[in-house]
UniProtKB/Swiss-Prot annotation:
Subcellular location: Membrane
Gene3D superfamilies registered for this protein in UniProt: Cytochrome P450
Record's protein name: Cytochrome P450 81D11
Keyword field contains Ribosomal protein: no
Predominant location: membrane
Keyword annotations from UniProtKB, A to Z: Heme, Iron, Membrane, Metal-binding, Monooxygenase, Oxidoreductase, Transmembrane, Transmembrane helix
Induction: By the diamond-back moth Plutella xylostella, the generalist herbivore Spodoptora littoralis, infection with P.syringae, jasmonate, cis-jasmone, phytoprostane A1 and 12-oxo phytodienoic acid (OPDA).
Amino acid sequence: MSSTKTIMETIYLILSLFFFFIFLSLKLLFGPRPRKLNLPPSPSRPFPIIGHLHLLKLPLHRRFLSLSESLNNAKIFSLSLGSRLVFVVSSHAVAEECFTKNDVVLANRPEFLVGKHIGYNSTTMVGAAYGDSWRNLRRIGTIEIFSSLRLNSFVSIRQDEIRRLIICLAKNSQHGFVKVEMKPLFMCLTINNIIRMVAGKRFYGDGTENDNEAKHVRQLIAEVVVSGGAGNAADYFPILRYVTNYEKHVKKLAGRVDEFLQSLVNEKRVEKVKGNTMIDHLLSLQETQPDYYTDVIIKGIILVMILAGTDTSAGTLEWAMSNLLNHPEVLRKAKTEIDDQIGVDRLVEEQDIVKLPYLQHIVSETLRLYPVAPMLLPHLASEDCIVDGYDVPRGTIILVNAWAIHRDPKLWEEPEKFKPERFEKKGEDKKLMPFGIGRRSCPGSGLAQRLVTLALGSLVQCFEWERVEEKYLDMRESEKGTTMRKATSLQAMCKARPIVHKVLDASCP
């Protein structure tokens, strides 16, 4: 009896499985099929496993524009990079649709190795996943770090560092033109400005204690900038992390970065007299809200400030001066505006910038042609959505080619020409996106523009400038890193104007 029961149970099980497979087969054969995704055009059929990784060439912004042109000037196109689906946007209208209509869905960030290891497991304001943690970081940044009140409290630092730059240039240029290497001076200016705001110390120039420490900081910044970006194949094809030792390199760099940032925090923590630096302020908040203001959060904020306020601002100043040297008529017009509005008895100050629209247009035009990040920081689709009529599956990475958008002939008249006057037309500045767009745009853009505009205005006001040679300066960009830097460092001929004597006299005891 027991044996018969076992046989019957076996028969029932076999019949059940048989009918289940019959049902499944019929459903697959005659049931509704999954909708085929309507994806943007792609440059070619992807290779097995690697996809379109073989198409990535530096600089990425030029390569992506070339791919867009090969697809009949596609406003958006798709790539399969290893295991990741990537959409590249080359249209202002499509970028706006991404970050207005789909702003929340596309507010996430992909986890790349630099963000994971250097960015404290992607917990910084720039790299954090969209959610409560990011909203808290954004609130901290908006209220405690980048508010107008906070930035105004550091105006004396910006003006002092610019005055030091003027004195440095004037030492050898009071009696005639001298050749000057501009890049190290701009890095000195921007690093000192940010580190004084953050930690109350200078790393370059008079009053510094350790030249080796200054070189160490500059080297760290350069290495992080070169290591970052959306073009690292190891972020799309994981096996390359081990084959190329890329992840090992990033981990070592992360250790050095953390050691430096922790040293800044520790120095301020043990000081008996509290200062007015960013770290002092954040440590005071840590005492009352330790869960929010952990050391990791504080170091992440400092890291973002240093990276966003040094290399990028120095690069923009170098491009701006190069443009002025290649367009002396623009330089003359800027000088006339400053002389007419400010006079020759005092230096231009931050509150004067509002009276110098042409100077502001020069900065805007520089950022148009040479955006700080030619490829905006990548976004990640947290849910399925539609952009420009195309399906955007969850997990898709969105890359925006700001460099291509800023040179789009459909958007700009004579886009390749350096023409600050274009921004005299109302609304032209709305087309710019050098600091991103939408809720993940750079919160520190105001600080960067304040320093760059004031520094550029001071250099125009205080010195005569000429090219070292008659030929135009080389305006090609470097292929390395996430930011747009000149391939060849700027050298210029500089001669002090009479107003510099007032600066020198004021600096004497």
